Amino acid sequence: MIVDNLKLEKLIGKGSFGEVYLTTKKGDTKFYATKKFDRANIEGTEAMKYLKNEIIILQHLKHPNIAKYEDVKKTKKHFYIVMEFCNGGELSKALEKYQSKHGCSFSEEIVQHLMRQIINAFQYIHKLKIIHRDIKLDNILLNYETEEDKNNLNLMKATVKIIDFGFACKISKTGLQYSTLGSPINMDPIILKKLKSEGKTRQLGYDQKADIWSLGTICYEMLIGKSAFDAQDMDELVNKIEDGTYVIPTSVSKEVISFLNGMLQYESHKRLNCEQLAKHDFLTKNIKDFHKIDVKKVSGKITGEGLNINVKKNRTIWAIFNSEDENKLSKIGGTDFTEPIEEKEEIESKNSGKNINESFPMQNQSAYSGPMLPNPFQGIPGNPTNQQIYGSSEQEMAQEGYVVKGGIFD
């Protein structure tokens, strides 16, 4: 398909509201990722608001660890959002492949390499007074310089790219936000509490420290291979976070425990900010100099080989976490658009001899998802609706300055 100077070469992903295509531009040898949205399905919906919001925010973000926005086009039937293409796909998929290949989650060295870049990106985002509000492994892409590194899953050579700013917002004049947006399993306890109460706790506000909690949850998932607060439904999730305990095997270093504890604090004011995290020993020290926990030196009764950390009471206790359990761990878990332009269907797609089908296989779920988001509790009894998870009322969004007219950066 030809859209202006774009050539949509191959479908590489699908989502709730649209599709993602590997794309080339006339006179350009680079690949791009183009999100295609059906206007009949998206115009007048909440998803359209998120789409406009994402475009406006991305136009103002320029950072090596944030996927670059390239262009937006409109035809009579579709919207097209052109983004930087990242050949490594989603970080969540990389973790699954790594676990399948090596039988374990990422090493501390790999997590250190990835978290340095992620924290670097969020230092930049937070300095612009923006809250992302939907940090999860699906919304982090990887890019490799060589096909060999990509094929060998050489994560130490991977560059991180943050995506999906549809739910992002600029901090209000009060410094707090109130709407319930995001993915529950990575959600700040305050937002989750509001979500569970169906918005009745309006007085509970949050700031950029909400992102810090989410960063803690993805860091944990990369290290341990599962969610810190693994749950089958909303009630169980809320109860686990309210209890405030997550388990870390004693094979990890003290630096890792301290790093996680700096993010996964129930009370947001106790969490470290991005500047503090960037200077933390886990990100600045050589892995070889890390201190491993010696169980024999820990006072008190040892009931197993794991450390329970209570994020609500900010204390630590020892609990059962044996090697058999550890082996079972696995991932569970207003912008101005151009006037409509013409779309041209092509029966065959040729691109300078590049084998598109072999180099870029179809993905089961789309990266660059934008508003094309699944319900993380779909099919689970007692699960919240998409509206509860992903959006607040239009009135509440307007009160935050979230519904954009002319741009949130005006």
List each language-model region with its residue ranges.
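Protein kinase catalytic-loop region centered on the HRD/HxD motif
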Residues: 120-130
